[in-house]
Amino acid sequence: MEYKAPIGVKIDLETGVIPGAKKLVRRLSDLKGYFIDEEAYNELLREDPVVYEVYAIEQEEKDGDLNFATTVLYPGKVGKEFFFTKGHYHAKADRAEIYYAIKGKGGMLLQTPEGNAKWVPMEPGTVVYVPPYWAHRTVNTGDEPFIFLAIYPADAGHDYGSIKEKGFSKLVIEEGGEVKVVDNPKWKA
């Protein structure tokens, strides 16, 4: 039997960078149609800020292996809505995932395909278990980068299309200086 070699990498806990990892940058323009306030989106789009960066160590897409990645989700808002990641289901929907908060403040918005949603606040040291079949999106509710580690099956894949089409049933907004989770008026069941 031929064995895969183990690897070890050091994550920069201040910046979230994993040296040598595959880097993905998502700008506001990559999130067209995701935010509820289109006017605020179009205004901020002139600057087209970086919303988040992902540093991934990926394996071959096969059963039994694991990928891991850090995400650096920058602070900001579009209208009242905090910056967030696109969010996704897994292409192999029966795959779970683990998130570990490293730095900053935020949370995870999760939902079933029927739109039953759960909000889990996150701060450094928080671990979130994402069960199979749940969509998930992270949200930065603070004023500094929100950095977290994700560990997931290498064959899980990402289904971004379902979220692009239907959205999440809830929005995470700032209202009166507080973080609130409210119904999304554009949610499509």
UniProtKB/Swiss-Prot annotation:
Main location: cytoplasm
Catalyzed reactions: alpha-D-glucose 6-phosphate = beta-D-fructose 6-phosphate
Protein's pathway: Carbohydrate degradation; glycolysis; D-glyceraldehyde 3-phosphate and glycerone phosphate from D-glucose: step 2/4
Residues annotated for Fe cation binding in this entry: 88, 90, 97, 136
EC class: isomerase
GO cellular component, one term: cytoplasm
Protein name in UniProt: Glucose-6-phosphate isomerase
